[in-house]
């Protein structure tokens, strides 16, 4: 089980646990502004890099919006791709949101347009996730049940 928390005092804090008894090769990863993906914001967080792509566990962008992908085993449900929708595989959602959204309000609006799919990344199975998003204005939990 993974846990995430936020705390607002003089500054905003966000943290999470990664409750595994082994390592999956996670490391601190920076995705710069000019990375060849949609969006404009730089991102830093914990990720496993596979085939040059950062598979983020959690991260924050340069505007202060943070997001964590948390295990939701047995409860996560993803949809099939739909024509005319913004189809985003579950492994790409965190990076897509943080690259494109500066605030929690923007992230909430963007998530209303997204169809989260269960497409796996290479040989990795689709992770069963829900997400915590937060900035200094508040927090929200997102899932696709």
Describe the residue ranges of each PLM region.
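A contiguous strand-loop segment
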Residues: 1-86, 113, 118
């Amino acid at each position: 089980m993974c846990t995430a928390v936020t705390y607002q005092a003089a500054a905003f804090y966000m943290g999470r646990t990664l409750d595994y008894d082994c390592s999956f090769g996670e490391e601190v990863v920076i995705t710069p502004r000019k990375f060849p993906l949609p969006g404009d914001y730089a991102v830093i967080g914990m990720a496993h890099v596979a085939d040059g792509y950062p598979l983020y566990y959690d991260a924050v962008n340069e505007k202060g919006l943070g997001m964590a992908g948390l295990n939701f085993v047995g409860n996560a449900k993803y949809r099939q791709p739909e024509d005319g929708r913004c189809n985003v595989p579950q492994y790409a959602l965190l990076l897509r949101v943080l690259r494109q959204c500066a605030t929690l309000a923007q992230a909430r609006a963007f998530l209303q347009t997204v169809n989260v799919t269960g497409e796996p990344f290479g040989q990795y199975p689709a992770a069963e996730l829900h997400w915590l998003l937060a900035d200094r204005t508040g927090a929200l939990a997102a899932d696709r049940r």
